[in-house]
């Protein structure tokens, strides 16, 4: 029970921070463009606490702490863009009610480039948050740098077949610089059944080896049962935590975030092409389990209060940065309802000089919503299966 509560608190904290920053991105961009804002809510449902600032914005903390939203004046249906007839009717109503000058304060009457800027500001805020948090981690704690020297080649594995030898120093994988053994593991994990060209230093010279990772199933304490690519290499002993300087922290963190974005895009591409098993897709249950497992691990292993505090700060920062990158990327996908879907509609409007017709928007919205809900249900099924929930329930009746 305590473990579940830790998981729940960690999940709600991390998710609230990431989503609030995402919505603040939309909020600050809208303010910069002179858009009237009606409400900023942390969470959904009935407001528990609310107040108005001097600009008339209602700030709320709502009863369901899973997400949040910002609502602009006249944006009752935030999922779509009004068509020309709706815009004309809305403009006339605003003029009648508030006067001609008020029209320009409404989101839908801003130039299309400003609306696109407001839409993209949410994901960009997530990426900026991740960069700042990773920078703090790199300065305060550092990054683990394990040796890229091969300590052992497991017999009968792809690494053995490719000709790896103990003592080889791995320099590059597919011309990508390798900085630690974790880089190798992360790169290989997503490339099962894909040949990888390794540049290896051996006896003072560089040789190239081609190895194709095999797909294996592993039980992971944090992620549960996962299928990953594996070569059969083990690193040589040795490693250290290397801190970034204040000057290099932001560039180093930016590289970290960019690498994560490329990894997510590559993983999604392989999934869509059927090159990776779809049962590896994870959702909110998986995120919660990861948050709980990481936090529980810190609580159980900390020898004293100081170590516990440091471990909790590090783990929650790491979770916030990682989830922030994922949410920022996923929101840029060109699916109606998401920010990326709005950007597609604005691109059409910029080219056609008019918004997409309302019936097409409605159809796109329904299709996008169905796609997202279907994805969430499928991901939840995978998570429950990965953590053997169905096996446990079945055992109750046998």
UniProtKB/Swiss-Prot annotation:
> Which parts of the chain span the membrane according to its record?
117-139, 316-338, 362-381
Q: Tell me where in this chain the PDZ domain is found.
A: 130-203
Cell location: Cell inner membrane
Q: What is its EC number?
A: 3.4.24.-
**Family matches, as InterPro entries:** PDZ, PDZ_sf, Pept_M50_Zn, Peptidase_M50
What is this entry's stated membrane topology?
Multi-pass membrane protein
> Is Membrane among the key words of this record?
yes
Enzyme class, first EC level, given as a word: hydrolase
- Classify the source by domain of life: Bacteria
Which keywords has UniProt assigned to this entry?
Cell cycle, Cell division, Cell inner membrane, Cell membrane, Differentiation, Hydrolase, Membrane, Metal-binding, Metalloprotease, Protease, Transmembrane, Transmembrane helix, Zinc
Needed cofactors, names only, are:
Zn(2+)
Residues the entry annotates as binding Zn(2+): 22, 26
Gene3D superfamilies reported for this sequence:
2.30.42.10
Q: Where is the active site?
A: 23
Look up the further comments and give them.
Degradation of PodJS is not regulated by cyclic variation of MmpA level.
List, alphabetically, the PANTHER family matched.
Answer: MEMBRANE METALLOPROTEASE ARASP2, CHLOROPLASTIC-RELATED (PTHR42837:SF2), REGULATOR OF SIGMA-E PROTEASE RSEP (PTHR42837)
* Name the UniProt record assigns to this protein: Metalloprotease MmpA
Species source reads Caulobacter vibrioides (strain ATCC 19089 / CIP 103742 / CB 15) (Caulobacter crescentus)
